[in-house]
Swiss-Prot record:
Lumenal-side positions: 29-746
Organism: Bos taurus (Bovine)
Protein name according to UniProt: Exostosin-1
GO BP terms: antigen processing and presentation; axon guidance; basement membrane organization; blood vessel remodeling; BMP signaling pathway; bone resorption; canonical Wnt signaling pathway; cartilage development involved in endochondral bone morphogenesis
Similarity section: Belongs to the glycosyltransferase 47 family.
Gene: EXT1
Top EC group: transferase
Length: 746
């Protein structure tokens, strides 16, 4: 019985196998016959429809789905042959072995330093607004030169941002235009900016012309094509991204615990087919509609309904229920999946919103990855492990989440909030490669205030900057140099400048006194100056302009600078107290005369006031202490146009210094004690000091406020209501218990 069953099973299997071979052979022969008939009919101009029982040809069932700039547009006529792909790839990888050592001429940078030349714009050439902003940022920077013979780096005026052939911004015949440039030199020492490259269906990283030995500052660049220590990966930004300044991050205060309404969110397009569709098509597996809200829509492109699947209607309905901004500001983590290209606008949006980015874009070289440690600000995921993302982020400790969130705000404000910062960061990275002996280290790039405000030309030692004392375990300086700005001749021994000099010299923290003689009269004889226990150095300014008081003089031997106007009235006790306060806040301006700014709605401009109000945003440098690094930053970071304005008006230098320090620290200055007698309306009426009583003086300061705010691109000044007084100040206790007892008598 068992043998019969075995024979029956073998016979059935053999019959099935024979039938399979038979019908398969017929199908194969029919297919070959059909292809021959098609070939024959093609030659004779005839067409025969294929039988219904033929095997389906799946590529025909999936029609091309063509996006551009993340806005879907279908153009089924676009076809890329294998030969065209090979040509595109060859142009991409032709200079793949380029590095700074092999494709960059360092000798051009040795003579004049790091200078950048922008080619003159050619008549008739259209330039997109985004590229105009890039060129404007370069031309407004301290690196710019209009003389190509002084240049170390060259930037094209031809718009290379959008190299998608379907884009209306695409510049045709770029290859011949670039080759005709007499300074091109096969791209050597050239930098090319690019946001979009390639087109449907592959989105290769081909920019459409031979870049030769040029460097690429490129968005959505892959790790495979990225040339380390040569190219620069930049973020993908929209045409509405501000040119300068930009909005600050949305994190106004830290919440403990740092959890928001949603754990993980995303809202964006769902690509049904093609490159970039795999991850977005699978997001619904992770979406739970509660604390993980991942929304996609099929409604994009002209013919989206032709490609819709059974889930589209449900996804579209769910998509409309949520407001993207509300989700963004109430989420702990934001998913940043790849689009058609590796980069996404969601990346910068998440950074600004203090929503920790969860990256799902395998192979993307993250922006400025050469200097930024993204593990401190983002979660780097893997597209292949999508289903593990929720459990991964839930396992992150709250302390780590808070640190990640704070770092997103720092990176956004330091490097990404404007086109100017993106461009300057790119240039600073290249400069660090050229001058490696004074390049910034990882701590500078990843800690406040960031690489753009810490100039390595000042010093290669972090302890010489006021921002890293805690990181290095150092104590702030114990001595200061008093710099007195003198503009009136010395005619009497009772002049305020001499009393001020003696009071400063008596301070236990004073190392030396420098008198900056900006008076038109000759220097007084040495015996006219009072005898002091510390050295007194008199420097005669060559140009005798207002900005000269902030020059980085080699004579200043201490890190702390006590800046004084010649008619300031301060006692030794007040000097000592201000300096001890500054030692706790070495990165800020600490002093006595406070002023404030406000927005004038009627005039739609910024205003300046010296009224005694409950808050302030400036401490004038007529009686203030700050770090001497700000002298170097004032001289070498600020543009000549602002300093020339200050010198021509002989005014506003103190306002400009406050703008600079607040822009760097993102913090207000600190006022000490309630002293109010330092007022512009109470200054002397003689000689050059009469500028304080000049009716135009106050109007000039109003104008300066708006000019400075325009250059910075935003208002960096921050209001504060904090005033620091000595312990037991004005308390009803014995005067013997008070350290700075003389301050109460003033």
């Amino acid at each position: 019985m068992q043998a019969k069953k075995r024979y029956f099973i073998l016979l059935s299997a053999g019959s099935c196998l024979a039938l399979l071979f038979y019908f398969g052979g017929l199908q194969f022969r029919a297919s070959r016959s059909h292809s021959r008939r098609e070939e024959h009919s093609g030659r004779n101009g005839l067409h025969h429809p294929s039988p219904d029982h033929f095997w389906p040809r799946f590529p025909d069932a999936l029609r091309p789905f063509v996006p551009w700039d993340q806005l879907e547009n279908e153009d089924s006529s676009v076809h890329v042959s294998p030969r065209q792909k090979r040509e595109a790839n060859s142009s991409i990888y032709k200079g793949k072995k380029c590095r700074m050592e092999s494709c960059f001429d360092f000798t051009l940078c040795k003579k004049n330093g790091f200078k950048v030349y922008v080619y003159p714009q050619q008549k008739g050439e259209k330039i997109a607004e985004s590229y105009q902003n890039i060129l404007a940022a370069i031309e407004g920077s301290r690196f710019y030169t209009s003389d190509p013979s002084q240049a170390c780096l060259f930037v094209l005026s031809l718009d290379t941002l959008d190299r998608d052939q379907l884009s209306p911004q695409y510049v045709h015949n770029l290859r011949s235009k670039v080759q005709s440039l007499h300074l091109w030199n096969n791209g050597r020492n050239h930098l090319i900016f690019n946001l979009y490259s390639g087109t449907w269906p592959d989105y290769t990283e081909d920019v459409g012309f031979d870049i030769g030995q040029a460097m690429l500052a490129k968005a959505s660049i892959s790790t495979e094509n990225f040339r380390p220590n040569f190219d620069v990966s930049i973020p993908l930004f929209s045409k509405d991204h501000p040119r300068t300044g930009g909005e600050r991050g949305f994190l106004k205060f830290n919440t403990i615990p740092p959890l928001r309404k949603y754990m993980l969110v995303f809202k964006g397009k769902r690509y049904l087919t093609g490159i970039g569709s795999d991850t977005r098509n699978a997001l619904y597996h992770v979406h739970n509609g509660e604390d993980v809200v991942l929304l996609t829509t099929c409604k994009h492109g002209k013919d989206w309904q032709k490609h819709k699947d059974s889930r589209c209607d449900r996804d579209n309905t769910e998509y409309e229920k949520y407001d993207y901004r509300e989700m963004l500001h109430n989420a702990t983590f934001c998913l940043v999946p790849r689009g058609r290209r590796l980069g996404s606008f969601r990346f910068l949006e998440a950074l600004q919103a203090a929503c920790v980015p969860v990256m799902l874009s395998n192979g993307w070289e993250l922006p400025f990855s050469e200097v930024i440690n993204w593990n401190q600000a983002a979660v780097i995921g893997d597209e292949r492990l999508l289903l593990q993302i929720p459990s991964t982020i839930r396992s992150i400790h709250q302390d780590k989440i808070l640190a990640l969130r704070q770092q997103t705000q720092f990176l956004w404000e330091a490097y990404f909030s404007s086109v100017e910062k993106i461009v300057l960061t790119t240039l600073e990275i290249i400069q660090d490669r050229i001058f490696k002996h004074i390049s910034r280290n990882s701590l500078i790039w990843n800690k406040h205030p960031g690489g753009l405000f810490v100039l390595p030309q000042y010093s290669s030692y972090l302890g010489d900057f006021p921002y890293y004392y805690a990181n290095l375990g150092l104590k702030p300086p114990s001595k200061f140099t008093a710099v007195i700005h003198a503009v009136t001749p010395l005619v009497s021994q009772s002049q305020p400048v001499l009393k001020l000099l003696v009071a400063a010299a008596k301070s236990q923290y004073c190392a030396q006194i420098i008198v900056l003689w900006n008076c038109d009269k000759p220097l007084p004889a040495k015996h006219r100056w009072p005898a002091t226990s510390v050295p007194v150095i008199v420097i005669e300014g060559e140009s005798k302009v207002m900005s000269s008081r902030f020059l980085p003089y080699d004579n200043i031997i201490t890190d702390a600078v006590l800046s004084l106007d010649e008619d300031t009235v301060l006692s030794t006790t007040e000097v000592d107290f201000a300096f001890t306060v500054w030692q706790s806040f070495p990165e800020r301006i600490v002093g006595y005369p406070a002023r404030s700014h406000f927005w004038d709605n009627s005039k739609e401009r910024w205003g300046y006031t010296s009224k005694w109000t409950n808050d302030y945003s400036m401490v004038l440098t007529g009686a203030a202490i700050y770090h001497k690094y700000y002298h170097y930053l004032y001289t070498h970071y600020l543009p000549a146009s602002l300093k020339n304005m200050v010198d021509q008006l002989a005014n506003c230098e103190d306002i400009l210094m406050n703008f600079l320090v607040s822009a760097v620290t993102k913090l207000p200055p600190i006022k000490v004690t309630q002293k109010k007698q330092y007022k512009e309306t109470m200054m002397g009426q003689t000689s050059r000091a009469s500028r304080w009583a000049d009716p135009d003086h106050f109007a000039q300061r109003q104008s300066c406020m708006n000019t400075f705010a325009s250059w910075f691109g935003y208002m960096p000044l921050i209001h504060s209501q904090m005033r620091l007084d000595p312990v037991l100040f004005k308390d009803q206790v014995s005067i013997l218990r008070k350290k700075y007892r003389d301050i109460e008598r003033l």
